[in-house]
């Protein structure tokens, strides 16, 4: 697993859009994302411009030893209800090395301690066993199953909604006197 010092999050910048575009257009990366792979770069640029000051989302680039290794996003941030949707993509060459767990913890620390969110939730394909295993390891629990939620490759797919609450996360990952890891983008 990458060391604590080799993994960090930083805010998504315009210069990162080519990297994001490569991830978005990789069918193996996007197969569990319930979205069509393949979007035009101009569409991605327009989305970036439209949402650059949107307070309902925080998007981070995951870096491992200074190299771009994935994306972590807190989207649909609702400050009244103190919740957000958690999303993560790790580049194929960095998968299986514990990076998703490290990056997720950094984003969760940010969500629960900086944004003071009460709840993080996610939607995952029921058949994505690797992701579900990682999410359970991080403390997420199943809230329910969404039947025939997404139409992908000619068939409907079920999804699982999972969540974790601030008090659960802090009890598991913060001890008295310990400083939580923070993304560099505070």
Swiss-Prot record:
GO CC terms of this entry: diamine N-acetyltransferase complex; protein-containing complex
Record-annotated site: Could be important for selectivity toward long polyamines: 85
Residues that bind spermidine: 35, 43
Keywords: Acyltransferase, Cytoplasm, Magnesium, Metal-binding, Transferase
Chief location of this protein within or outside the cell: cytoplasm
E.C. designation(s): 2.3.1.57
Positions bound to spermine: 30, 35, 43, 51-54, 85-87
Gene Ontology MF: a single term: identical protein binding
Active site: 135 (proton donor)
InterPro entries reported for this sequence: Acyl_CoA_acyltransferase, GNAT_dom
Temperature-related properties: The level of spermidine acetyltransferase activity increases at low temperature to prevent spermidine toxicity.
CDD domains in the cross-refs: NAT_SF
Domain N-acetyltransferase stretches: 7-167
Effect of residue 135 to A: 300-fold decrease in activity with spermine as substrate. Retains the ability to inhibit PrprA activity
Metal-binding keyword on record: yes
Protein name, entry field: Spermidine N(1)-acetyltransferase
Protein source organism: Escherichia coli (strain K12)
Gene that encodes the chain: speG
């Amino acid at each position: 697993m990458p060391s604590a010092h080799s993994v960090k999050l930083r805010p998504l910048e315009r210069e990162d859009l080519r990297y994001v575009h490569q991830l978005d257009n990789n069918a193996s990366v996007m197969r569990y994302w319930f979205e069509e792979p393949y979007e035009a770069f101009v569409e991605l640029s327009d989305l970036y411009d439209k949402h650059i000051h949107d307070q309902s989302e925080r998007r981070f680039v995951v870096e491992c030893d200074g190299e771009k290794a994935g994306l972590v996003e807190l989207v649909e941030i609702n400050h009244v209800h103190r919740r957000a949707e958690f999303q993560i993509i790790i580049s194929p060459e960095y998968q299986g090395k514990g990076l998703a767990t490290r990056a997720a913890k950094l984003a969760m620390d940010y969500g629960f301690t900086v944004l003071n969110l009460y709840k993080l939730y996610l939607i995952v394909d029921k058949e994505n066993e690797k992701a579900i295993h990682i999410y359970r390891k991080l403390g997420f629990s199943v809230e329910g199953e969404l039947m025939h939620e997404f139409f992908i490759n000619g068939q409907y797919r079920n999804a699982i909604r999972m969540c974790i609450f601030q008090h659960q996360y802090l009890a598991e990952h913060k001890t008295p006197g310990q400083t939580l890891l923070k993304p560099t983008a505070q």
